[in-house]
Structures are given as C-alpha cells and as structure tokens.
Amino acid sequence: MGCYHFHLNQLSRGKGQSAIDAVCINQIGNHIFEMVNAVAEKKQRRALDLYYELLALKEPPMRILFLLVRQYRILFHVQSLQVKGYGRKEIAEKAGLHPFAAGKYMEQTRYFKMEELRAVLEESAELEERVKTGRLTDTLAVELFLVKYSS
C-alpha cells in the first residue's frame, strides 16, 4: 500500500499525521534496504525500479543518495567488526543497531569486500560534489551510482 492510500485511509479513521509519517518513513527505509540488496545481488533493474518508486513518492534524489550512503556506512562498520571477530550481539551493541538489524546487515556484507565498500563511500562523496557544483543532476547521480554498483 502506498503512502498516499495509507494517508487517505488514516485520515478517514482520524489518525494523526505522525502515524502517517512513521509508516511512510518506514516504507522509504524498506525501499532503501531492498535497493542495497538489489545492488549487492547485481539486480540492476530491481534497484532502478525501487529508485523510481521512491521518486514517485516525491523523495528527493539527494535524500535517497544520503540514505543509500548511510546504509553502506553501516555495512562498512558491521563488516569491520566482523573482521575483528565480533558476533551479532556485539556488533549490534557497538554499531548501535537492534540485533535483528545487525543480523540483516551481516547477511548483506557477504556480498561486499571491504575495498568495495570503501570505494562506494568515496564514489558517493564525489557524486555529491559533482551535484553541488552543477556538473551533474541529482537524479542522474543516483542512477549512475545504482548502475555502476549493480552491474
């Protein structure tokens, strides 16, 4: 169910804006997590479809990029803790994650090498700089990011 339909349904039931926002934000977070999965699994079409769905929900491309990069930072942190021999519980504590989420991130890290995650983070900083200096549109920057890392 899209945020729009949920919004109308909740308004008719007298629910507050905060409940609506919480579900919409959760939906966006789920899309971002799924997008990272699609990129990791080299499912380019799926990654782009999720991106276009977020754009249809009026999510700004730079916010999408920010959320993607946040996920990759978490993956980098989780993987660095795994390399040091920490288990799920310790990773959850050190990374400030719920143990379930830590487990999900640990599953995602199997698709990446540390060098790849580092490269993703460096590339995202370069893309952001190119957008801010007007050398690249924000929409295209996210598309390039998704295409590059899902091929």
Identify the meaning behind each predicted range.
Residues 1-15:
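Amphipathic alpha-helical "lid/sensor" segments that cap RecA-like P-loop NTPase cores
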Residues 4, 43, 50, 120-123:
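Amphipathic, well-ordered alpha-helical segments in soluble domains
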Residues 7, 56-79, 116-151:
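Amphipathic alpha-helical interaction/assembly segments
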Residues 12-116:
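Small-residue-rich helix-loop
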